[in-house]
Amino acid sequence: MKTPDTCIQLIVGLGNPGNEYEHTRHNAGQDFVEELARDLGQPLSPTPKFFGHFSRLNINGKDVRLLVPTTYMNRSGQAVAAVCQFYKIPPEAVLVVHDELDLPPGKARLKIGGGHGGHNGLRDIISSLGNNKDFGRLRLGIGHPGNAKLVSNYVLKKAPSEEFNAIEDAIRAAQPHVADLAKGDWEKAMRELHSKT
């Protein structure tokens, strides 16, 4: 599949709000964006008009917005659509960071477009963007419990320390590649990240 050369203008970290969900598997995307904002010295702040916590920063001369929706996971699209409409950001300039059952902890994979794969956050974003699936995704592996009936309980729990550390390692490995994505160099970001994790 051809990689795009679209510069990423919005990075969205998916998760559920509230202390009971902090650092659960389902909040891996939120953890990524919160750590990125902190590391770049631009912490997120509550922004009601965007239904989430928001920050705006400069990465290598490129204007990039960071968003963590404070709606629940299955309403994430409300926040994404609000930012995209306000700043006139096309779906292909959006990167959604989310937990991925089909990858083991410690893996991080970039992907362009595609379906929602049963992920309620992705499902709502696709719907809120007018059924547009063209946004990028950073998939952070959390592993699978082995039985579909166990998934909803599994994703809302904290991972055991070994798995949690592997997820954190993947988050740290992926963060430097945001600079490549901000300038539209998907090919380099994919090649280097996928060889590391």
UniProtKB/Swiss-Prot annotation:
Q: Where in the cell is it found?
A: Cytoplasm
The UniProt record gives the binding positions of tRNA as: Y21, Y72, N74, N120
Site positions (Stabilizes the basic form of H active site to accept a proton): D99
The record places the active site at H26 (proton acceptor)
Q: Name one GO molecular function term.
A: peptidyl-tRNA hydrolase activity
Task: Please give the GO cellular component terms listed in this UniProt entry.
Answer: cytoplasm
Keyword presence, Cytoplasm: yes
Asked whether the UniProt record includes Cytoplasm among its keywords, one would answer yes
Q: Please give the Gene3D superfamilies that the UniProt record associates with this protein.
A: Peptidyl-tRNA hydrolase
Residue numbers for the site described as Discriminates between blocked and unblocked aminoacyl-tRNA?
A: N16
GO BP, sorted A to Z: protein quality control for misfolded or incompletely synthesized proteins; rescue of stalled ribosome
Q: What is its EC number?
A: 3.1.1.29
Q: Provide the catalytic activity annotation.
A: an N-acyl-L-alpha-aminoacyl-tRNA + H2O = an N-acyl-L-amino acid + a tRNA + H(+)
Keyword terms, alphabetized = Cytoplasm, Hydrolase, RNA-binding, tRNA-binding
**What span is annotated as the signal peptide, if there is one?**
none
Its job? Hydrolyzes ribosome-free peptidyl-tRNAs (with 1 or more amino acids incorporated), which drop off the ribosome during protein synthesis, or as a result of ribosome stalling. Catalyzes the release of premature peptidyl moieties from peptidyl-tRNA molecules trapped in stalled 50S ribosomal subunits, and thus maintains levels of free tRNAs and 50S ribosomes.
Name the family.
Belongs to the PTH family.
Q: How does it assemble?
A: Monomer.
Q: What HAMAP family does UniProt report for this protein, alphabetically?
A: Pept_tRNA_hydro_bact (MF_00083)
Protein name, per record: Peptidyl-tRNA hydrolase
Organism field? Saccharophagus degradans (strain 2-40 / ATCC 43961 / DSM 17024)
